[in-house]
Amino acid sequence: MQTAQINGTTIAFEDTGGTKPAVILSHGFLMDHSMFDAQVAALRDTHRVVTWDERGFGGTKATGDFSYWDSANDVLGLMDHLGIESAVLGGMSQGGFLSLRAALTAPGRVEALILLDTQSGVEAPETVEPYNQLHAAWVEHGAVAVQDIIAGIILGPV
């Protein structure tokens, strides 16, 4: 993987390169850029495809608190670093959250959105608490300690 300094963070990414129309894919929570390997293989002959690891996942470390707005600025900064003026942004789950925010931040740079299993609204109050518990447990005890909380969020009560 390549890396670039974007907004004070070392962002890990892969880029098929070239001058073809650009597609930038942002992964979901608890995943990394490799979730899009099949899509990269399918698109690489007709598009420049960029996948990246968002803060706190894969090869990109989280260096402090950040928001989806920060992540949106990361993808726009990555576009600047790669000399990509505009692109189709695709995102799954949290990747969709940040892709939507990038489109709101810089609408002239986003040609289209590909949104998978994501939403544009605010989380319902009853779903916020499990995420707060997840965050607190992760910060205090690490990723292994949160597997039951994650299972509950994904699968319902266990």
Residue spans for each PLM region:
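Structural signature of beta-strand start/N-cap positions in the alpha/beta core
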Residues: A22, T46-R48, E85-V88, R109-A112
